[in-house]
Amino acid sequence: MEKSIGYLGGPTTIYHEIGPMETIWRISRLYNISPESIYSANSLSPGDPLIVGRKLIIPNATMIRHVINLYDNPQWKYIVVHHTATGRGNAKTIYVSHLDRGFSNGLGYHFLIDNGTMGKGDGQIEMAPRWIWQQNGAHCKADDMNKKAIGVALVGNFNRDKPTPNQLQSLSFLLSVLRSYYHIPPAQVIGHREVPGAKTECPGKFFPTDQLRKTAGSGN
């Protein structure tokens, strides 16, 4: 599933920091250019290892897209929305943080929606390795949600700040895609604190739960 989210005002050269499990193919789809142009601009060849954190030259980029991989998997019955409780971050930094906390597979969420810090776009959706490998989450033990819920986190501390408009727009798009593909009813799209048995304020007191309800209910 792909959706254009912004035009760059004509072909321009930008830099993209490689996230966990990213591929040249996916990066090329993000910016609407060919894989070959990325290989050439960065002196890479197909099959060369991609180092997480390396900044790639993206030549002649014209737009930025959401690119969401979908997999046939009947285990996904819920979507649980979180905040990272950090003002800054991206998939790479939170992946490392979760490894340090003992999460053997790193980043505990399946998707991360960036807030424009740490080299990522405001509202950019990053797919975590857990999603690519279709692994259980490590985002909500309560009610056994790690085994049945897709974990979506927005970068930010929403006990202190509000999500950005771009983050909420991207969340709406992602929820629509996931709900449609996995036939998840609106009542099963919930904030972390709404999970039975969860003792947390996540996704924070300034997260617009009413808007989440409206978005899930409308399918937009």
What are the functions of these language-model segments?
Residues 61-65:
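Short, charged beta-turn/beta-strand-edge "cap" motif at the junction between a beta-strand
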Residues 14, 52-54, 77, 107, ...:
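Envelope-exposed proteins and targeting segments
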Residues 18-22, 29-32, 84-89, 161-169, ...:
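Soluble non-cytosolic domains of exported or imported proteins
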Residues 1, 67-77, 115-129, 141-150, ...:
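Basic/polar, cationic surfaces and motifs that engage anionic cell-wall
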Residues 30-34, 41-44, 59, 84-87, ...:
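Structured segments of extracytoplasmic/periplasmic soluble domains
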Residues 2-32:
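Primarily a LysM-type cell-wall glycan-binding module
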Residues 15-22, 35-52:
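Short acidic, glycine/serine/threonine-rich helix-capping segments at coil-helix boundaries
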Residues 67-133:
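Short, conserved "active-site rim" segments that organize catalytic pockets and cofactor/ligand binding
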